[in-house]
């Protein structure tokens, strides 16, 4: 098995601030290269599913309320209780933003350049199902779901390892089963053993 770290166009964090989830960065090659490798080895790729780049098309469209990108990113209002939130970095979590006269707060678990996606919007989930199928069609047989434990947020919770996240992973697994392809999902979950084990099966 060959694990390719994020090969998408990105703006920071060693490739994990993805600007376009459908492309291979020009400096790294193209989809034909990945397909060629997949002929002789299993290919594992990161699906950076929790967040996307603040410099990508989705976020630019989000600010303009255009598709694709409209309502793709997570914002909360001033009443949201984030006091229990668990996260790995210490920069300011929320950034005040005003879009078309409405003031909200952008959610940024990992960095100011990585804006968390809003999986309460079904369009975001549908988009990542399409991305997953696109990767399968281009030779990827193992998915590493990056930062998956942080995917879902609820007011007043730790915003990590919530049941809704598990349901989304199960849905992705069921779609793979329907496609009848030999594909494995691996979750990046840096959690205590009992919580880590909850992602198996």
Residue ranges of each PLM-predicted region?
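Acidic/aromatic-lined carbohydrate-recognition and catalytic surfaces
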Residues: 1-129, 137, 148-201
């Amino acid at each position: 098995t060959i694990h390719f770290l994020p090969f998408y166009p990105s703006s920071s964090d060693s490739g994990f601030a993805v600007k376009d989830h459908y492309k291979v960065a020009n400096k790294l090659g193209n989809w034909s290269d990945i397909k060629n490798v997949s002929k002789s080895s299993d290919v594992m790729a990161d699906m950076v599913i929790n967040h996307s780049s603040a410099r990508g098309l989705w976020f630019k469209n989000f600010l303009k309320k255009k598709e694709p990108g409209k309502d793709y990113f997570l914002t909360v209002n001033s009443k949201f209780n984030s006091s229990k939130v668990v996260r790995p970095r210490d920069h300011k979590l929320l950034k005040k933003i005003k879009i078309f006269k409405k003031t909200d707060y952008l959610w940024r678990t990992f960095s100011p350049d990585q804006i968390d996606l809003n999986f309460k919007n079904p369009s975001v989930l549908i988009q990542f199902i399409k991305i997953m199928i696109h990767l399968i069609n281009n030779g990827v047989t193992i998915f590493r779901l990056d930062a998956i434990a942080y995917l879902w947020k609820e007011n007043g919770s730790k915003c990590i390892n919530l049941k809704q996240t598990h349901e989304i992973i199960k849905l992705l697994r069921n779609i793979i089963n329907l496609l009848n392809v030999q594909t494995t999902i691996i979750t990046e979950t840096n959690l205590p053993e009992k919580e880590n084990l909850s992602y198996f099966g």
